[in-house]
Amino acid sequence: MSALSGKVQTVLGPIEPDQLGRTMTHEHLTMTFECCYFSPAPGDETVAQAPIQMKNLFWLKQNPYSSHENLLLLQETNAVREELHEYRKAGGGTIVENTTQGIARDLPCLKQLAKESGVHIIGGAGYYVDATHSEATRKMTVEKLTDIIISEVLHGADGTEIRCGVIGEIGCSWPITDSEKKVLQATAHAQTELGCPVIIHPGRNPGAPAEIVRLLQEAGGDISKTVMSHLDRTIFDNGELLEFAKMGSYLEYDLFGMETLNYAYNLEVDMPSDSQRVKALAFLVQEGYEDNIVIAHDIHTKNRLTKYGGHGYSHILKNIVPKMLKRGINQTQVDKILIDNPKRWLTFK
């Protein structure tokens, strides 16, 4: 394994795992989500093009991907800096920043935010969904993709010496594309060499997470060091959830704070409320999976920042944890979900 064995790699350099503290395993601090812009419904064009303001906040909450301005989180560095200070005051220690190639990863910005806030920030290596892959990326061999991912972890990414500490979020569509399959294979090969954590964005279908795990396994990936994101918008049947849980990955519920009537990317999905998310966590704990759960907000649009009336990065610590404690999840189990499980996942083998 690598010289990073036993360490966690942040944008400021390696640290001891015990330094992490409470960790949000899936967030974005600076990015663009324009790749996934969704045209507004007929009649909504005017509000979609309007600046973000009080009178359209509810519309934005229901249609977050139909406003170009809302998708430019990279414009809000000052607001994010303030949020990180609040996150630290609320007891937060670390944020895993999941922005990869294709959605405006900005490691120098993350490094500056880490210095100014005192929050540990971990950068992500690799590639997002096929829609963000360049033609050059699509033409690369698995070996070339592997070399790039390894280099982003060991030497630095995007022409900097700032090193990533996790591979991902690695983006997968439904159905998964050939280019995404190559990236998954490269991810598994890089993980084998580095002993590092991996985090996956699955396609929006209940069968997607299991298919991805099988592809990673076939390529030699370590599922025990892999997080499957977005389960709260992907698997809704408890039986199917338990079948997937048996495959051994970390189970991530990472859309806390996002409560919307219609989910634009899959209208068949009824986006759960935070109360339903907590209920799902309690179910998994009851079924013996407390050592596999991690949670986050996956903030990726402006309207979810407190500057715009959103819940912000401290929502879980301030509001969700008390709810968890009232719904049958004890403090030891909460600490596993927020501290112990992320620490185990993020530590290089």
Swiss-Prot record:
CDD domains: PTE
EC number, UniProt record: 3.1.-.-
Pfam families: PTE
InterPro entries referenced in this protein's UniProt entry, alphabetically: Metal_Hydrolase, Phosphotriesterase
Keyword field: Cytoplasm, Hydrolase, Metal-binding
SUPFAM superfamilies according to UniProt: Metallo-dependent hydrolases
GO BP annotations, alphabetical order: catabolic process; regulation of appetite; taurine metabolic process
GO cellular-component term (any): cytosol
Gene3D superfamilies per UniProt: Metal-dependent hydrolases
Binding positions for a divalent metal cation 1 per the UniProt entry: H26, H28, E169, D298
Record carries keyword Hydrolase: yes
Required cofactor(s): a divalent metal cation
Catalytic activity, reaction form: N-acetyltaurine + H2O = taurine + acetate; N-propanoyltaurine + H2O = propanoate + taurine; N-acetyl-L-methionine + H2O = L-methionine + acetate; N-acetyl-L-isoleucine + H2O = L-isoleucine + acetate
GO terms for MF: N-acetyltaurine hydrolase activity; zinc ion binding
Entry's cofactor comment: Binds 2 divalent metal cations per subunit.
Binding site for a divalent metal cation 2: E169, H201, H230
Keyword Iron part of the UniProt annotation: no
First-tier enzyme category under EC: hydrolase
Role played: N-acetyltaurine hydrolase that catalyzes the hydrolysis of N-acetyltaurine into taurine and acetate. PTER also acts on other N-acetyl amino acids (Met, Ile, Leu, Val) and N-propionyltaurine, but at lower rates.
Family to which this protein belongs: Belongs to the metallo-dependent hydrolases superfamily. Phosphotriesterase family.
Name this polypeptide is given: N-acetyltaurine hydrolase
Organism name: Salmo salar
Recorded name of the encoding gene: pter
